[in-house]
């Protein structure tokens, strides 16, 4: 999955590692990964990606599990908090587009029932700021969904590793690892 250059460069020097993208080659769409990716990997790094993936959260996690060989490792960072449930910014997201530019961007959504919704004050991440934040996970949901789709040995890591860019300025979004059961 797409991750920061600091991770990708180091991993490429050490392993047979490929950093993938949603918008350019090499492509990996975690919503529907190509057959060639299934059951192939010893480890997958997902660094601040899942909050941008549309569709049900559990689908992306199930597909992450499907990428891994049995016993394979998922290393995951994603914004989460210790609130009761995952916060979906656009719970009826169905057919959507972004209109406008800069601070004037608006998300236009057509719900499954055909109702048009318009949202402003959007939160964008990454690169040129074009990647829309769709949700903030609740840690309890994330942990439960990982287990539900077949991950075991789910661990929250609080140690810092500055050489890898793991610096905890906030306890929310600490790295998580899980093994494919």
Q: What are the roles of these predicted feature ranges?
A:
Residues 13, 37-40, 70, 171:
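Residue-level preference for short coil/turn positions at secondary-structure junctions
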Residues 31-45:
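A short acidic, Gly/Pro-enriched loop at the edge of an enzyme's catalytic core
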Residues 2-35, 82:
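Class I SAM-dependent methyltransferase SAM/SAH-binding core
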Residues 21-22, 55-181:
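S-adenosyl-L-methionine-dependent methyltransferase catalytic module, highlighting the catalytic core
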Residues 18, 45, 75:
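Conserved Rossmann-like nucleotide-binding pocket used by diverse enzymes
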Residues 42-55:
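A short SAM/SAH-binding and catalytic strip from SAM-dependent methyltransferases
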Residues 27, 49-50, 136:
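Alpha-helical architecture
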């Amino acid at each position: 999955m797409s991750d920061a250059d600091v991770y990708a460069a180091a991993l490429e020097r050490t392993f047979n590692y490929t950093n993938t993208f949603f918008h350019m080659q090499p492509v990996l769409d975690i919503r529907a990964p190509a057959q060639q990716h299934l059951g192939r990997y010893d480890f997958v790094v997902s660094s601040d990606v899942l909050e941008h993936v549309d569709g049900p959260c559990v689908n992306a996690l199930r597909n992450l599990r499907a990428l891994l060989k049995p016993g394979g490792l998922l290393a995951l960072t994603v914004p989460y908090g210790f609130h009761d449930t995952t916060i979906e910014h656009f719970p009826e997201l169905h057919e959507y587009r972004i209109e406008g530019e800069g601070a004037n961007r608006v998300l236009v959504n057509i719900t499954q029932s055909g109702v048009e919704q318009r949202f402003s004050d959007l939160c964008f991440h990454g690169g040129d700021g074009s990647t829309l934040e769709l949700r903030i996970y609740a840690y309890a949901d994330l942990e439960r969904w990982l287990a539900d789709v077949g991950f075991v040995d789910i661990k929250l890591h609080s140690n810092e590793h500055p050489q890898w860019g793991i610096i905890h300025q906030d306890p929310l979004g600490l790295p998580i690892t899980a093994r494919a059961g």
